[in-house]
UniProtKB/Swiss-Prot annotation:
InterPro entries: ARM-like, ARM-type_fold, HEAT_type_2, Vac14, VAC14_Fig4p-bd. Residues 333-373, 850-880 are annotated as: Disordered. The N-terminal domain mediates interaction with FAB1 and VAC7 while the C-terminal domain mediates interaction with FIG4. Changing H56Y: Loss of interaction with ATG18 and VAC7. This is Vacuole morphology and inheritance protein 14. It is a peripheral membrane protein. The gene is VAC14. GO terms for cellular component: endosome membrane; fungal-type vacuole membrane; PAS complex. One of its GO terms (molecular function) is identical protein binding. HEAT repeats lie at residues 82-119, 243-280, 388-425, 429-466, 517-554. Component of the PI(3,5)P2 regulatory complex, composed of ATG18, FIG4, FAB1, VAC14 and VAC7. VAC14 nucleates the assembly of the complex and serves as a scaffold. It comes from the Eukaryota.
Amino acid sequence: MEKSIAKGLSDKLYEKRKAAALELEKLVKQCVLEGDYDRIDKIIDELCRDYAYALHQPMARNAGLMGLAATAIALGINDVGRYLRNILPPVLACFGDQNDQVRFYACESLYNIAKIAKGEILVYFNEIFDVLCKISADTENSVRGAAELLDRLIKDIVAERASNYISIVNNGSHGLLPAIKTDPISGDVYQEEYEQDNQLAFSLPKFIPLLTERIYAINPDTRVFLVDWLKVLLNTPGLELISYLPSFLGGLFTFLGDSHKDVRTVTHTLMDSLLHEVDRISKLQTEIKMKRLERLKMLEDKYNNSSTPTKKADGALIAEKKKTLMTALGGLSKPLSMETDDTKLSNTNETDDERHLTSQEQLLDSEATSQEPLRDGEEYIPGQDINLNFPEVITVLVNNLASSEAEIQLIALHWIQVILSISPNVFIPFLSKILSVLLKLLSDSDPHITEIAQLVNGQLLSLCSSYVGKETDGKIAYGPIVNSLTLQFFDSRIDAKIACLDWLILIYHKAPNQILKHNDSMFLTLLKSLSNRDSVLIEKALSLLQSLCSDSNDNYLRQFLQDLLTLFKRDTKLVKTRANFIMRQISSRLSPERVYKVISSILDNYNDTTFVKMMIQILSTNLITSPEMSSLRNKLRTCEDGMFFNSLFKSWCPNPVSVISLCFVAENYELAYTVLQTYANYELKLNDLVQLDILIQLFESPVFTRMRLQLLEQQKHPFLHKCLFGILMIIPQSKAFETLNRRLNSLNIWTSQSYVMNNYIRQRENSNFCDSNSDISQRSVSQSKLHFQELINHFKAVSEEDEYSSDMIRLDHGANNKSLLLGSFLDGIDEDKQEIVTPISPMNEAINEEMESPNDNSSVILKDSGSLPFNRNVSDKLKK
């Protein structure tokens, strides 16, 4: 440069610096006209070395910036592109200067350079975008204002030229190959043709890594800057930014958690636009695919309608039809002019035709629409060949579902909902991860989140339900899904628990082995569900249990009932509140006989006598009162399976009153009387008296209507009378005593007991005594399959063992022993029926203040449960 120009550029006054820049511009223009490019190189080198790179000299850097801008203006649009690689680096370096004035002039200089370079500036877009991203958060208002002007200019250039501008940097006169070529032998001149470099100045694939790095910026101004740029790139035709959606989608979700409302607003708008674009492209590709399938169908129909029978041999006719079909199919990917070229197609080998048909079918069946070389003159629609990477998008969405921000969760759910309707199959590999988060959202406090989560969960359930047939085997990894469901079940609320059971039921129908492999977790899930108070959850759990405990899977039922009894033994509160209901529901869903058989055999192995007595009383009470047990009661009454009665009798021997109740249900009154006589030989405990009191109340229930009518036939049922009178003689005089006594006194007994017995004996000797009802009602136990003596001996053995155990306990604990009151281990209110009836027995009043009366729908339950001492006050009250 001339010294005057150099001095003017370094002047403190802006007017003098501006005048010097104009002189420099004239000088460079003169060099361009004269072709003195060497001097231009020296001027640029001087401006960079001595001025723009002069660190800690703000005035020198300002001079260099003005000089470089003037040089770029002088070079013009035709020549500036070749010098940008030397001009731009020092200008961009000044954006990081500590002096705000230098940063301001850097913005001004780059603005002037970009205004001249236009599309050529796009070659250095990454570097420019990087400095703009940093300067957008500048603390100085003047610098930020200049940066906004520069940013606006770069956006305009990108919007206009990014999708089609090809740089001329490598297409100048320097280094080009000759346009003509002369043949050295003949002397002929030929024109050379070279392939044009079609590489665009702007490269989106090169820009995406930088965007991925910057998208996680924290500064709100930078975030707004990034969102604005993404809008520009998204709306620029031909760039196809949506193809790189997974690269920046995760960063946009972090913007939604920004504390500044303007950041959240612009981000929300951008994400709506992105989702709309995804939806548009997917629908477009689906529409194009359907059109192609329709074209194929039309061609096939045209072939079928045009073919007529000929006199050719069958093999030749089939081959001809096949070649004709190949001709029609070939038209899908060839120009129209080639469709009529029968000669070329007729010479095609049949093996090649088959291979072409196979590839064509694979193309039509593919999920994404692939790009074809020629589309028979069809108009190209932007977006029809874009490949949307849904798996990576879903990964980002699932990660953001676990966010603590409600807005982020809502948008992630909305995206998942839309993509599920577009391409549901891509969610199959992500089911386990999605459900682990989605089930938590079902219990969210925000109703909007819960509502959308329910919809998404329903869509996923429908998706898995639609996977049927061998072709889908192995596509869904049910094992991880089951693990995820069982883990989420215990920490979830009711809605989430119900959803978990819905999934487990579905998986069992699809892949039973996957459920059966997770026995421990399944048992815990079912037990937790049955212990809950929600009716829908219990219904789902029972439905799953019914599926798991199929008729052929007794081992599963046994293991489940073992775990259930273990839970009851460990959780006394659960026994008090839910044991009756749980056992009743399980028996109603499964076969009652099957459940009673299995659970009775399990109780035989328990050493805890008190717990065993509790469970036997629950089973006995349910057998008498539950409507679901009517079939089992009828089976016991008709003695269809004597061995079943025998097994129940032996298992229930630890609880004598329950054994007597069983005999009453089976109408085996002789056996009941014998048991009563046998047990009277041992010391009667308070527990037994309480249960007898309850049994007397149960005699008034509808279940024993038949027994009460049988009291009118004393000659046929003498042991019924003896048993009832025996119970009357055993219990203390109380309200229960008065109730039973009134019932017995209401009978019109006009004969003595001896006459009744003699009449009974004479009737047994009569060969015509074979009435069907009397056979059922009055069976001789000694002649039946119930093995009378064996059962009585077993009962005696159990009673003696229990008597010995009681004596040992009294010796160990002495006078302070507190015996557990059977019948008082449940709460006073049956939570499933919510019915309370006033007590009828002062004996029970001596123990508990209130007691429910039985009905056919609920068990008899004593209130204020707990282990109570049999003290003197109770004894005195019983005596009274």
